[in-house]
């Protein structure tokens, strides 16, 4: 009660103090207004007095009026001065009263502080009055399951296993799941899943779940032990964990692919040569070829891609065993050439032999350096794979060079040498020349010709043939002892007759970057310059 009364007294004192302050402010405003009026009247009185002193021509009535006006102004000035003094006295009285009210307020505040209780006292009193009651959990009455508790179906499966006498089954599949658990929220997040081989899986860690079909073991993280022990997992938690692991694995599956190179045709794998190059086969890919170099016809697959050419050493004693689908490209040299071969034993070894079925003999003496040096396009590649031995082979004359018997330079130095038993020079413009060339070709069935379109030279060892080829500029070379074509065949007809649709010939070879092979481009330009009937 005392505290309430003191609070009322303090509130009343504050209210009175506020009113006194408002009265003081109003009176001060009035004093300012009175002072302004007083100042104005004094100035007016001095002006009129100055006018009266300077004007002596006024009548008596006017002078009387001026005197009465001056007296009225003097009275008003006195009244304003007295009013100002009174207001100042009232302000002084109000200020004294305000001081008394402030003093009374301070006294009431001191008494109130002595009587009023602090916040801590109030809290203590409230706590003393209110009794604390213990919180009752709804699950407090349910006892916790013991660690040795097992579900009924687990016990039944164990008992059935014991009765049957079967040994414990081995794990068929194992997976390592890395889980991060938030202590505050209790949520588990699957970070990664790693399949583990069941043969390498060992029962490590603490078993937290086992229902006879699935077993879960808790492992310690790297460098840290488990916090507050390990609790067993409920079946619901296990299913949720497996579901999250499955989702995590399906989000970013592991994909395997072959190595990708920035330049597909600029670098090859070790021990492998691209089939678009010179066609040297790896010894591991030579299926259907015996150790003696004999090709088995049944083991030869049907080529579905552009054929390769295998480079093997000559001579070839087993040439008769090779499939008849390939043209015979070996040349029977004359006696002078044989003598030259005896002096130069390396000439025959540098020759090429064509095998159209992408197979060939592999010689260990064949160094990898020679394979890398001869990776560009060769004229031997241009021979189709489906030619018949009974049909003549038409070739394009690109130039010639004399090859004397005593020439010290071996003809094998020229790239793409082809040896033929019969060479017939045909001129389409003159039928008589065709017959003469045919006769001359029959008389010289053992002549040796070396053709190299890539280097734009043709080596012919027979002097008779040298005389006959000086005249024409557009000629065809026919092999295998057959009559030449009377009329030149078009490129499309020749491709159709040689099975172009099934086996593409190398003169249509396109590089992987979309451009034609440079050697083929040069060959086409040279053909265009020879005349209108060049194949």
Swiss-Prot record:
PANTHER family: PALMDELPHIN (PTHR46881:SF1)
UniProt name for this protein: Palmdelphin
Regions of compositional bias (Basic and acidic residues) in chain numbering: 437-446
Pfam families linked to this entry: Paralemmin
Origin: domain of life: Eukaryota
Organism per entry: Xenopus laevis (African clawed frog)
Subcellular location: Cytoplasm; Cell projection, Dendrite; Cell projection, Dendritic spine
Gene designation per UniProt: palmd
InterPro entries xrefs: Paralemmin (IPR004965)
Disordered: annotated segments: 423-450
GO biological process, one term: regulation of cell shape
Similarity annotation: Belongs to the paralemmin family.
Gene Ontology cellular component list: cytoplasm; dendritic spine; membrane
Compositional bias segments (type: Acidic residues): 424-436
Chain coiled-coil ranges: 1-105
Keywords: Cell projection, Coiled coil, Cytoplasm, Synapse
